[in-house]
């Protein structure tokens, strides 16, 4: 009963914070403190959402498709990279610095180059999403593999287990927690990456919609 009351109280605080935020937002916009073209009021946002709902869904479908494809490829590439870096020290030393370098370049700087090289279709968007999502996946999985219990690994080796068996029964299960934490980060990255690339060139998508209605 006490725990249930705590959950209700916690949710009430969250709802109250959202209500206060919306109220302040409405006041700032209605009073003209912030111009409406910079910060439309919540009511204007709801009205625009209802009015443009079919068009929004059409553009959202494109953005979500790009996000899904890019995230899927990012997870696959990140998984393969993590496995190779875990198994081969030479690959780790050669590939890890390149991974870090790709993450130091701002996304907004990479996107125009990808659009220039690949055109205005889906390819540059998916490529950008892969670039921004595979790194968290690869690092999360690699840390998970390396956090596997050493005693268990040594025991399996003593019993004659090969690398694949050790990976499937010890390393992979121990990496799942970090994998899902990294996946949660990558999901947010994939949507942001898709919208940014659509801003800079494209025919459909939420980024294109935002540019047109600005």
What positions do the PLM features span?
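Transmembrane alpha-helices
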Residues: 127, 131, 164-196
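Hydrophobic alpha-helical elements at and bordering transmembrane segments
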Residues: 49, 56-60, 64, 94-101, ...
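Transmembrane alpha-helical segments of polytopic membrane transport and secretion proteins
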Residues: 1-19
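Generic hydrophobic transmembrane alpha-helix motif, especially the helices
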Residues: 100-136, 143-144
């Amino acid at each position: 009963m006490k725990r249930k009351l705590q959950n209700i109280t916690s949710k009430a605080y969250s709802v109250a914070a959202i209500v206060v935020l919306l109220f302040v937002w409405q006041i700032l916009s209605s009073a003209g403190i912030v111009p409406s073209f910079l910060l439309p009021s919540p009511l204007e946002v709801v009205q625009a959402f209802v009015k443009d709902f079919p068009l929004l869904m059409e553009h959202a479908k494109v953005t979500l498709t790009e996000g899904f494809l890019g995230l899927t490829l990012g997870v696959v590439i990140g998984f393969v990279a993590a496995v190779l870096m875990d198994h081969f020290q030479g690959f780790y030393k050669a590939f890890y610095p390149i991974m870090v370098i790709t993450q130091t370049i701002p996304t907004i700087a990479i996107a125009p180059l990808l659009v220039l090289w690949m055109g205005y279709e889906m390819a540059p968007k998916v490529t950008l999403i892969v670039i921004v999502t595979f790194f968290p996946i690869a690092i999360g999985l690699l840390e998970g593999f390396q956090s596997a219990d050493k005693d268990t690994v040594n025991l399996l080796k003593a019993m004659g287990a090969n690398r694949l068996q050790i990976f499937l029964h010890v390393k992979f299960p121990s990496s799942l927690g970090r994998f899902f934490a990294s996946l949660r980060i990558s999901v947010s990255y994939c949507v942001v990456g898709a919208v940014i690339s659509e801003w800079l060139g494209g025919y459909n998508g939420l980024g294109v919609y935002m540019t047109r209605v600005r």
